[in-house]
Amino acid sequence: MAEQKAKVVHGPGPRGMGGPRPKVENPGKLLKRIMDEVFKHYLPHCILVLVCIIVSALANVQASLFLKTLIDDYIVPMTKQATPDFGPLAGALVRIGCIYAIGVLAAWLNARIMVNVTQGTLRNLRVQLFTHMESLPIRYFDSHPHGDIMSVYTNDVDTLRQMISQSIPQLVSSAITIVSVFTSMCLMSWQLTVVTMLMVALMLFCSKKITSMSGKYFVAQQKDLGKVNGYIEEMMEGQKVVKVFTHEQKALDGFRQLNDKLKESAKQANNYANIIMPVTAQLGNTSYAVCALAGAAMAVGNVGGMTLGTVMAFLSLNKGFNMPISQVSMQANSVIMALAGAERIFKMMDETSEADEGYVTLVNVKYGKDDELVETTERTGIWAWKHPHHDGTTTYHKLAGDITFTDVDFGYVPEKTVLHGINLYGRPGQKIAFVGSTGAGKTTITNLINRFYDIADGKIRYDGINIRKIKKDDLRRSLGIVLQDTHLFTGTVMENIRYGRLDATDEECIAAAKLANADGFVKRLPDGYNTMLTNDGANLSQGQRQLLAIARAAVADPPVLILDEATSSIDTRTEALVQRGMDGLMYGRTSFVIAHRLSTVRNADCIVVLEQGRIIERGSHDELIAKRGKYYQLYTGNLAEN
């Protein structure tokens, strides 16, 4: 079971911060897109950062080169003087101190600017990402695990932060340092430069060899880590079941088995990875020692004009050459990993937004002369569909709540149709109830009314208007929906009710709560309507959460209600309380109701019985009971279960 829920976890690996390099399509295109996001708002900052990096790198090289002058022109001559004059030496030390200070100041300024650039870019990217996510169709969220979407906001954005703030600046700095140091070393001594390059080649060869040996073990480590995380998540979600059946020891044994396997794979992987740094460090020290011995021999033999100052300057450059070489490999891998995260970010941003070809809008109206509908900005409680025409004229059609399905076919995927030839209607003020077995298509029909999905064939009309012509926002504003899975947001009770209509007053929210019969329990909460709700309203019972969801729908005062199994998870006493409130809420409104407890739909104007996506019966409760068909079986079976 844990294996089925295991998630891919990106963790550290042998290549600096991440094991085997992920495969990325079009890395150049991705990198350009990232840099375009950065340069769009921070191009002057980036130019200043580049200047700081160049100044810092050249200051370090210049400081190393100054050692030759310091030793050959100041220290060595002073050793031959009977009474050394320290004045020139002090001046030289001040100059080298200034060089170091300039390098440090440039590095500090670079770091400060990059913090601003990085955080600003990520802020803009998160806003774009969230804005686009809000425009995606429900189908996207149905087909993508929520954990994967969250991972884009957390893991992938964080790897991008590391790349922008650290990896790219260090790569640029390393490249400038390598070029400037290599040029300086060649000008000083080509012989010692050859020795240095041979040791660097050996260093890179050893690193690549060790990395290739550890790669397969890091793949195993990532898989085992995913299994452990999946098992922990599964046990957390099923903790009540574990305790009810007293399977704590069994759960612990299962965890130990997976944890031991993770330990072994991680140990094998890190046995190799942990020796990369010591090996490269020792090879760097070896390069330093070899150059020191060779340089000393050349200086003693006066080969190629080698002096003590030249040897010391070259050794300083040698030390500064090995470090950026190793950094390039590490930071290049970090960039590749960040590009893998960026690929997922941009893939989400490139998803097609929810299409909306509608042009009919919902507006407030009032009656003018001769009972003509006139659009107004006032909240009159009278709504109308504003229908612009090709000839430039506009007509207003009063919203009534008349919904009709004509020969509707639908499938969540093209190759599988789940609704077949659906014909039904809901007249203004009618209560239409959908019943049927699980998977019969009840919820699917309500999803089509609010255009969470678009139909494959047929027509759905709202007050005689094809709903494809109605803008989705306006269509959904005309609907009050209580979903099967109630979701409450972090905030006060009042704020959660007001979510149904953001401009609702406190009095209107309280009136909606009274209509939903939620006012009584809300007043008993510690702070009443100002009680804070967190963690999806975990401090409320399921029934109380359902009542608030109904109040949220009520405050919107919609002409059409969709109640998706609104009382399926409430106890009988609370159900009666809810039902009284719902009867008042549904009065005068077209209502589509789905309920497991068929006793709640007895008073429906029309009961529609669905089976395998087809309407097989319709009529009032008494009519369907008299037929002794599918509804009769469901109803009598439902009563027996209750």
What feature does the model see in each segment?
Residues M1-N60, I75-I96, N110-M114, T118, ...:
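Membrane-integrated ABC transporters
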Residues G13-P22, Q119, V127-S151, N155-V157, ...:
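Short intracellular "coupling" helices and adjacent cytoplasmic loop segments at the cytosolic face
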Residues P20-G28, V51-C52, A59-I75, I99-H146, ...:
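Juxtamembrane helix-loop junctions of ABC transporter transmembrane domains
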Residues K32, V51, A106, N110, ...:
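Hydrophobic alpha-helical transmembrane segments of ABC transporter permease domains
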Residues K40-L43, I138-R139, N155-I164, I168, ...:
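An intracellular "coupling" helix at the cytosolic face of ABC transporter transmembrane type-1 domains
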Residues H41, H45-L58, Q166-A220, L293-M306:
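Transmembrane helices of ABC transporter permease
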Residues P77, S184-L198, Q268-E343, M348-T352, ...:
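Helix-loop-helix
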Residues A82-T83, V365-N642:
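ABC-type nucleotide-binding domain
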